[in-house]
A protein has these predicted regions:
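Glycan-recognition and catalytic cores of secretory/periplasmic carbohydrate-active enzymes
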Residues: 20-263
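Positively charged n-region of N-terminal signal peptides that target proteins for export
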Residues: 1-4
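Bacterial N-terminal signal peptides
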Residues: 6-17
Length: 263
């Protein structure tokens, strides 16, 4: 994460602290020690948190989206063939835009904002246009194909543990952050548009990794994909995505790390 986006992290934490189950979810979880409070049941009117959350909505989120306009959003436009030019930045920069979208979704949940909602809708449409037919979404490779520079590696997924270039590709890292953002958006708006894009990518990952002879057994370079899968399970009461954690030692550790991070 680059310095320009770091300021967003703290601002995203406050709305996320009231992280909660979605419209069709059960409250509580057998493997999570804290029962989350649904967003719709949280209303702040104090003199400490509410002003800060208001600043998050009016200043921090717009500032972060403006920062993402420098390279991150243009990369998605190029992947969608809506803008000319090559990829800029690092491949994991895709995740920064997902993180900002996640924080914006929490902001919407705490303070409805028609303009912000419209901005998110436009970005979600862009994500859908950039996404490959099979669900793959990693702008560096989509723009440059197998000639993607740097840590991307020569083919999909192969460089997840940095075996080719020495630096992991962050394909699964980006995907994990997309899933988290999509779940947050669904919780805040009851709109499945972003969730459906994430489902398409997650289905591809679930199909790609596993115990089968044609499936990959490469452990991820970061626990974020496990965290995304666990967030899906926690928020939507669905075990649809565990990403082969019970088959691959690295993924099982990834899931356990994700549980610790969430707690």
């Amino acid at each position: 994460m680059t310095k320009g986006i770091i300021l967003f992290v703290g601002a995203a934490v406050l709305p996320a602290a009231v992280y909660a189950a979605g419209p069709d979810a059960q409250t509580g979880s057998r493997d999570y020690p804290v029962n989350p409070v649904p967003m719709s049941q949280v209303h702040l009117n104090d003199v400490f948190w509410k002003p800060r959350i208001d600043i998050n909505s009016s200043v921090t989120v717009p500032s972060c989206f403006k920062k993402c306009e420098e390279t991150r959003i243009p990369n998605f436009r190029r992947a969608a063939k809506l803008q000319d030019g090559g990829f800029q930045g690092d491949p994991f920069d895709d995740s920064d835009l997902y993180k900002v979208c996640e924080g914006a979704a929490y902001s919407l949940a705490s303070k409805p904002d028609a303009a912000l909602n419209k901005q998110l809708d436009a970005l979600i449409v862009l994500f859908g246009k950039a996404q490959q037919p099979d669900g793959y979404l990693y702008t560096s490779r989509i723009i440059h194909g197998d000639k993607a520079p740097g840590r991307a590696g020569p083919v999909r997924w192969l460089n997840e543990m940095g075996g080719v270039t020495g630096d992991d590709s962050h394909e699964l890292y980006n995907a994990g952050h997309m899933i988290e953002a999509a779940v947050a958006h669904y919780q805040a708006t009851d709109n499945r548009a972003f969730l459906d894009i994430a489902v398409k990518l997650a289905d591809l990952i679930q199909k790609t990794w596993g115990p089968g002879p044609e499936q990959l057994k490469i452990s991820p370079g970061h626990q974020e994909i496990g965290l995304g899968g666990y967030r899906w399970h926690q928020a939507l009461s669905s075990r649809r995505y565990r990403f082969g954690c019970w088959h691959i030692g690295g993924f099982w550790q990834c899931l356990r790390d994700a549980q610790q991070w969430l707690q």
